């Protein structure tokens, strides 16, 4: 591992995070006032709906990093190049099926939301969804290159690229909004920048990393191993969608776009909160995979878990206390008094969410050791309970009901069950 790459990558992760959150804090209230509460709710509902297509990745993203890192550490170049070819084929097929599923969703939008949305609102929703579907289908085969870059432990380039996109995107989106293109223009610009970013990553892989893509031999034994590994990542992805996207769908169906907008503001703060923990945790999967390949001791891996966990604990508790003290007043000034319920909704999730956010490196360790199956099974059961609890609670308490169901689920899944598992398996 290049220590300089890792250290600079960590610094850039937090620079990127700071800039992203700062831009969002400045940009979100402007956007709310330019497109209105209802259209903001429509945009977030579309994001949640199409976001479900992201699970069509089937967990192969983590598999790219894990197995490419393994072949790099073993200096198996031919296997690495054929692995790249295999993933290109897999992701192209997934992109095609994503397009088909997306079109099915698009066709059924009127049936799902005609009772709680006006004709104009449905038109905006369908246009946004159509754009997002095509972007999702294209992003699958292009997305492999960002995973390859991480496998080579080149942390600086993707972080710098991310910082640039975070600066450019809101500027162009703002120009689009003030010229009257609304949420549709906002989505179009995000898609264009996303595709350009993926193309730049692809060029970096070929020109700088000198990777090759070969289709000479499809290794069915490694494919079987990858599918088994990825399946439980896929289950975890479904769980994440149930946790973080289903509430908007339920509220959109039961309460309409305005309630979705309020809940989305609360979700924005949850995203900020999560990002401070996950900013560097994604960098550890290739590192831990190579440590295991070289037969480093469990004690060394456990020390990484504890060290990073302590740092994350200090960061997360500092942020949480700050939000408890000033969050309510900030939301009313920042977004408007009509969003004041977002404070209590956010806290119902943020407080229990602190538990898993100080243990994010643990997931990388479980994946590297192929011990992530148990976590996926537990989370799936808890997520289903959360889903069925959210519906009646949403009818009683709107957004607060959904947040309460999510918070209780996190306490059971992460606070009780997974803590016990980490104690037994990662110590």
Annotate each PLM feature.
Residues 1-6, 123, 184, 201-244, ...:
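Interhelical loop/hinge segments that connect adjacent transmembrane helices in multipass membrane
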Residues 3, 7, 136-164, 184, ...:
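Membrane-interface junctions at transmembrane-helix termini in multi-pass inner-membrane proteins
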Residues 5-70, 98-103, 135, 170, ...:
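Signature of the first transmembrane helix
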Residues 9-24, 189-201, 205, 220-290, ...:
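Transmembrane helical elements of multi-pass membrane transporters/channels
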Residues 16-19, 159-208, 229, 270, ...:
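Hydrophobic alpha-helical transmembrane segments
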Residues 31-54, 183-188, 222-229, 251-271, ...:
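Interfacial/gating helices of multi-pass transporter permease domains
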Residues 58-74, 151, 209-210, 266, ...:
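Helix-loop junctions and terminal segments of transmembrane helices
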Residues 107-131, 323-354, 400:
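Interfacial segments at transmembrane-helix termini and the short loops linking adjacent helices
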């Amino acid at each position: 591992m290049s220590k300089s790459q890792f250290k600079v990558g960590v610094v850039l992760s937090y620079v990127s995070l700071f800039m992203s959150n700062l831009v969002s804090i400045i940009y979100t209230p402007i956007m709310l006032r330019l497109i209105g509460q209802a259209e903001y709710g429509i945009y977030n509902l579309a994001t949640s709906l199409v976001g479900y297509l992201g699970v069509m990745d089937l967990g192969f993203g983590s598999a790219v990093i894990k197995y490419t890192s393994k072949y790099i550490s073993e200096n198996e170049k031919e296997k690495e190049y054929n692995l790249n070819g295999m993933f290109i084929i897999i992701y192209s097929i997934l992109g095609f099926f994503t397009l088909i599923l997306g079109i099915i969703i698009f066709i059924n939008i009127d049936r799902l939301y005609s009772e709680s949305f006006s004709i104009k609102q449905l038109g905006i929703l369908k246009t946004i969804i159509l754009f997002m579907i095509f972007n999702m289908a294209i992003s699958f085969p292009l997305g492999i290159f960002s995973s390859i870059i991480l496998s080579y432990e080149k942390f600086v380039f993707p972080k710098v690229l991310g910082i640039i996109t975070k600066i450019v995107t809101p500027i162009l989106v703002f120009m689009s909004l003030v010229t009257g293109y609304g949420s549709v223009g906002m989505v179009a610009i995000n898609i264009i920048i996303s595709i350009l970013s993926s193309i730049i990553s692809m060029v970096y892989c070929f020109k700088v990393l000198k990777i090759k893509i070969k289709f000479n031999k499809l290794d069915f034994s490694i494919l079987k191993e990858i599918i088994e590994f990825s399946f439980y990542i896929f289950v975890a992805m479904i769980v994440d969608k149930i946790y973080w996207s289903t509430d908007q769908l339920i509220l959109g169906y039961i309460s309409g776009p305005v309630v979705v907008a309020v809940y989305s503001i609360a979700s924005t703060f949850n995203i900020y909160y999560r990002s401070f923990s996950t900013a560097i945790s994604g960098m550890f999967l290739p590192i831990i995979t190579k440590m295991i390949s070289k037969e480093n001791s469990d004690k060394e891996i456990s020390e990484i878990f504890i060290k990073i966990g302590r740092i994350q604990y200090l960061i997360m508790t500092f942020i949480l206390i700050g939000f408890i003290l000033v969050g309510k007043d900030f939301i009313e000034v920042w977004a408007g008094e009509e969003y004041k319920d977002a404070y209590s909704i956010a806290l119902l999730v943020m407080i229990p969410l602190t538990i898993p956010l100080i243990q994010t490196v643990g997931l990388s360790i479980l994946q590297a050791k192929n011990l992530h199956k148990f976590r996926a099974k537990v989370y799936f059961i808890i997520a289903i309970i959360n889903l069925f609890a959210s519906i009646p609670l949403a009818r009683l308490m709107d957004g607060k009901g959904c947040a309460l169901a999510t918070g209780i689920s996190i306490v059971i899944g992460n606070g009780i069950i997974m803590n016990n598992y980490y104690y037994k398996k990662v110590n």
